[in-house]
Amino acid sequence: MLLQQRSWWGSHGGAWGPPGGARDSHETEFHAALREAEEECALDTATVIVHGVLSDDHGGWTYRTVLANAPMPVTAFAVSEETKQVAWVPVDDVASLRLHPGFAGQWAALRAALMPLTVIVDLANVMGSRPDGWWRDRAGAAKRLLDQIAVLAETGVTTLPESVPAAAIERWFPQYVVVLEGASKAAAGPAAPEPRLRIARARGSGDDEIARLAGETPGQRLVVTADRELRARCEAAGASVTGPRWLLDLL
């Protein structure tokens, strides 16, 4: 976890916590968090992907922690007078540091939220759950669903199925892996690339590909399907499972 040690002259000088600061009036919490990380730690924010937001409401003002992960190692170093040093700290070692009181009070909730969530979508099953004429043009129907999921990936979700052991996060930004099979594999992806959406075109059985992903994908996994046999295979692999209705209600 990337942490900064505050300069001695600042509030709680010498304490450790995540980079951050005040949000400008025109900024979202995401823009503010990434800007502060860049200004204080020289972090290349183009290399990280946001996966959640956790709020701490103090009645009159709110502290929001934006959670993000980097798919590859990235460098960071102190570039602000407010920062004495920065370090990548193993999660198990965080509690041993002298932490900023606000961060220390949130650490248990933050630690539970560090693991990103991947939603694995059985597109054939979801597509078959809504009667929009998909049987006349499977590739076209798959394209419509992909476009809608891309929007959802960008806006995030505020509710997860009860089957997911979720932390107290205000908004999740999962990774989506959408599995296509058969005629649906001809569907084109969204016109605008979305870093949280990946299309997996199954070479063989779509169910086999979904079960493989459920077992091999790191972090929390949520499989969206109503297929009983596939649900059992995914649950046996350690993934959570929900039916298509959860996803369709969000689109």
Report the location of each language-model feature:
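Unchanged
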Residues: 22-115
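Short histidine-centered catalytic/ligand-binding loop motif
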Residues: 16-26, 134
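Nuclease catalytic cores that cleave nucleic-acid phosphodiester bonds
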Residues: 116, 121, 127-251
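Anionic group-transfer/hydrolysis microenvironments
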Residues: 6-7, 92, 124, 183
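N-terminal strand-loop-strand
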Residues: 1-18, 45, 49
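Short, charged/polar surface micro-motifs in flexible loops or helix N-caps
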Residues: 1, 9-10, 24, 69-74, ...
